Structure formats: C-alpha cells, structure tokens
Amino acid sequence: MIFVLTLVALCTAIHCPDGEVEVDGACYPSSCVFEDTVCNNHGTCTASVCRCDSGYSLGNQGCYPSICYLASDDVCNGHGKCVESEHGSYECSCDQGYINDYQVCVPEACYTEEGVCFGYGTCIQPTDGSAPYCRCYPANAGEKCTECSSEAVLIDGACVHKSCLTEFVPGETLVCNGLGRCMIMPFPNIHYVCSCYPYDGTFYNNTCIYNGCITEYNLYGITEVCSDRGICAGTRCVCDSGYNGPTCEYKVVDCEPGFVSAQETCYPEACISDESVCGGHGRCIWNNDGAACACNDGFVFYENTCIYASCIVNGIVCPHGTYDASMNPPRCICPTDYIGRNSVCYPSSCVTNSQTNPPQLCHSAGSCDFDTGVCSCNPTNSGPTCEECSSEATLIDGVCQPWSCIDERNPDALSVCSGKGTCIAYSGRDVFDVCYMCSCDSGYETVPGGICVPNSCVTASLIICSNRGTCTDGVCKCNEGYSGALCEWYQCPTGQTFVNNLCVHEECVTSYDDVAQTTSVCGGYGRCVEDDGSYKCSCRSDAKVIDGECVNESCITNSATNEVCSGHGKCNGYNCVCSVGYFGKHCNVKTL
C-alpha cells in the first residue's frame, strides 16, 4: 500500500525545465516569479518578462504599485515597505531611521522640510554600514547643507556661488549681472553657470550681458560690449573716463556751465537724461528763455527726457518696473516676480488669470497691493488670492455671493435676489464697512432675506402676501382660511364675521351705516358668550342689551321702552349715529 502511494506521488510531481519554477501546478520562467507568485499576482508573464497591470511597475521585487518605485528599482528605494493606506492608495512605510519624503525613504540624517540635504546636496549612504551624511554642493555647507560655504554669498535667502556674481560697480553686487539665475551644472564636474533671462540678457564671459549694451556681435557670439569703452553693469553701460552715451559711443567734450556733453556736442542740462539727448526720441530746443525737448509722436516730455507715452501710468514711468529706452519702441521691464501688461507690472502673487488683458487679479474678488503683492479680499471671499468663499457668502455659479442677497426659500436651489435683481455692495462709514443688498428689477420690491418679489404681492410693511400665502406669477395664492389681494382677510366659518382680527358669531356683530361701514362686537360694550347652543352679548355695567347688542347708557333716550337715539339712529360708542333726516346729540331734531 505504501509503495502504491509513493508511486502515485512520483507520477503527479511536476518537474520544470532549467530556468523555470513551478507555481500553482504550472511552470513559469524564473524571471517572472516573485515571492512564490507570478508577477506578484499583478501582471502577466510574456516572453519571460512581467507585463504589470495598470498602476503597477516592474522593479527588482516584481510588480508593485508604481508610486513605491519612484526613487529606484527597489521598493521604497530599499528602505521601506509598500503598504495600502486607509484611503485605498499605496504608500511607503519607511524603516526605522528613515522618513517618507514624497514616497522616498530618506535617512533622518539627510532630511529637511525643504528637501533632501536642503535641496543643495546629495545624501550619501555608505555600504560599510556607517551613518548616512549629506555631501553638499560647492555653494553650501553644514551638516544638512543649510549654510553657505566660503565659496558663496547669501543673497535673498539663497547661497549664490561667487562665480555667478558680478560687481562691475563698487558696492553693487549682482547675480548674473541682474539678468539671470545661477544654475548648478553636474557635468563634467559640478560647477555653476548663469542662465540668462530670455530677451533681456545674453551669456558672455560667464555672466549675462544686457542686450542693450552689446555693440558688436557675429555668428560666434558677442565681440564688443559698450563700444569697448566701458563695462555693462546691469542694464547700463558704465563708461570709461572721457566717454559717454548709452553704449559709450561718444567722446566727452568740454562745455560751458549749464551745458552737458552728449553726442560729442554741448546741450542744455534740461534736455539731458542718462547722458542722452531727449532720450533719443526728440530734439532739444533752446533760447534765452530756457530749453526743452520737442518729443517725437507717441512720446511726452518728462523730467528732461522724452518718454514713450504708453509707459507712463498715473503720472509714473513704469511703476514697479524699469524703463528700457533701448527697445523700439521702448517698454517696461518687470521684475521676475511681476507680470507685464500694457506697461503695468502686476505682482505675480496676485495674478489669477494671465490670459486676460489686463490680467485678472485676486480672482476679481479683492484688490492687490502692488508693493507687497498681497490680496485684500472682499467680505465675500477669503484665501491668499481670494479663491475661497468667506463665512459671509456661498458659492453660486462660480461666484461667492453674500448671504444677505441669497433667496433661501428653496434650500436645494439657492438664487441671488430670486433671479430678479442684482446684488449691490454699499459702503458704510468705514472704508471696510461694506454691506450687500438686492437691487430688484423694475416691478419688483426688495424684501428682507435676499428676495425680490412682484410689487403686487408685497404689503406696505414689506411682507409677502401678509405671511398668509405664496406669490405666484405676481398673484398671492392665499392659505386656507384667508382671502384678499394680499391675503389680508380671514375667511370665517359660516355664521361668523371677521371683526377686529377675530371671527365673531353674527348674533354679536353690530354694523354701522357710517362712511367707513364699521363693525364692532356687541356695540363695543360687551363680549360674545355662548348660551344653550346659541350666542348673545353680555354687556358691561354701563350698557344694556337692546335688540341683541350692547348699547351705552348715554345713547338710551327712553329706558322704559329701550328707545335708542330717539328712535332715529344707532349708538356707536358713546355717540348716536343719526339716520338720514335727523341730527342732534340724540337724533331728536328733524332736518328741515
């Protein structure tokens, strides 16, 4: 029996060829088998290679979520495990001594919130088991590269290598001559070069030369700067002694007092700015009365020179920018953190749509401080660029609308001013005191609660249908029991009449034939009480029941016969209301 079982086992065992491995009763190339599975159960083996499922990538450990293979071909760069998060996605769970930095397991010794080795170095992990450390780029130093080395200078919070610095003018140190950025280059050896801003500068002698300083060049590059008679410092030529002009092209001549050498000629000082005559866009005219520039078309005289008119905004030349007269036509050059449109430099931090002209600022929901680049939001908005709704507003059709203008009668379909008006901001006494109210269309009335209602449905006290109905197509549809154009009347049950906002049994109602056709309960001198299923008046002590109503004693002219107002009128309060043809206190005088 034992022999038979052994024979069966030998007959059913699978023997895979060399280079293949048995998995679940089948043979697969060993290159596709990981952790005793085929492609980690997240791919298929094709031509001895795992083709991973969507969202997975092939690495040294097989098919794993792509996010866990970001840094190397090892899962979590060999210092962690790929685990499923509580949200269903995957992430690296790093080993002790390592920190997850955007799904890369970084040694704590190299980690900073600003990046690995502060973003200015490489984390070295020795193979001999010694502690990891930061190898800083030449411009940086310190345990985690957070300091500047002796080869660099701290400028605007960054360590700039001295090879990128220029100081053509004593005391005026510029990064790449103020026209570029200092970039690190890894090959062939780590070094720094200037990357010049397009249209502003050209790389020359390891710095950026302002294009307006270039006086000669050929197919191979720049051959002459500032006419070889000066240096280009920033956006201007600083000429050698004895020369002047925008590119040092003129010799200086001796001039009389009040005159200045320009273009190798003497001109009145009133026409000279930056050593040019009228900015190169006009003629200098002078006589015994003085001197001034006659500017070309499109230019205006401004502080001894001719300025391109489009570059002057509110009386200021290129606010927050630099006027570049070397261009044709001249233009405003904005700093790197500003965006230029129509000679205006807008802070980039405020610009929320650069495709419009002028660009949209602060999502059109606030004002931008051009000096600080900070948005001051309207009361309806909040956030760095006013992109969110404040607690005083809600989002409707992409716009933060103030609650004071929102019709909330239908919570599932909020509307602004009921769709029949415009929400207007009104300023209070304080500049920051702003309130919002609906300005309704013609034929509509503004009602508290952001509601615009047809005039025909609103009472004098701005109540819709007297709070007793709904307004539909300009007509009040009254609730049950009410009537009238504004639902102002209450419909009493049969046998009752509406008197003084109450339903009163008709047996107790007194009517008067006066001009106002007034009514009262029991003549105003009693109350209506039930008596064996019917109703009657119960009078005050100074009144008497006569014909079912309470009559004040001052109106009774014969108590024995219950005569009221001499039989020619009715009592209304303390007075007689005489019938036609009679007058007098007790209606006892007949009209002639």
Swiss-Prot record:
PROSITE patterns: EGF_1, EGF_2, EGF_3. It is found in: Cell projection, Cilium, Flagellum; Cytoplasm, Cytoskeleton, Flagellum axoneme. Residues 64-104, 106-146, 267-307, 353-387, 453-488, 546-588 form the EGF-like domain. This is Neurogenic locus notch homolog protein. One of its GO terms (cellular component) is axoneme. Disulfide bonds join C68-C82, C76-C92, C110-C123, C117-C134, C136-C145, C271-C284, C278-C293, C295-C306, C362-C375, C377-C386, C457-C471, C478-C487, C550-C565, C555-C576, C578-C587. Glycans are attached at N552. One of its GO terms (molecular function) is calcium ion binding. It comes from Giardia intestinalis (strain ATCC 50803 / WB clone C6) (Giardia lamblia).
